[in-house]
Amino acid sequence: MSDNVIAYSLVDHLHEREVKKHCYEKILFTPHVAEFFRGILMTGNFFLTQSTSIPKIMQLFETFYVNHKLIQIQTSAPNLQQVRDTSKVIIGGFEFDTKLNRLSFCCVIDNLLKGAATQAIQNLNSAFGFEDNLGIIKSN
């Protein structure tokens, strides 16, 4: 593993199945494991039914996540250092393949601070109508 990155579950990863069941059927992604202690970087691909543009996609994501204080949308591809020691999610690096109507993007989290416990707090906050970051460590 030293000085290496390894792809695993190249098709039908557990989390890919979850996203397909609950969010969007036409997503593909492959997780990778690397030598670093914390952080997850995911590259996702959506196959859309029609052509679009990056500005439209950015506007769609920004509008959808406007009330989610722990989610940040940016133009450039995010990196793990941007989320280190935070509970936030950064989504960015949007690119669109017009030949395949494929939208590609990246998402990063610090899985030690944006893990199951933080997600549980966010879910409870959402269920009771509280702000999503109530009771969660403030991001740097």
What is each model feature region?
Residues 1-106:
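C-terminal substrate-binding/catalytic lobe of Rossmann-fold NAD(P)-dependent oxidoreductases
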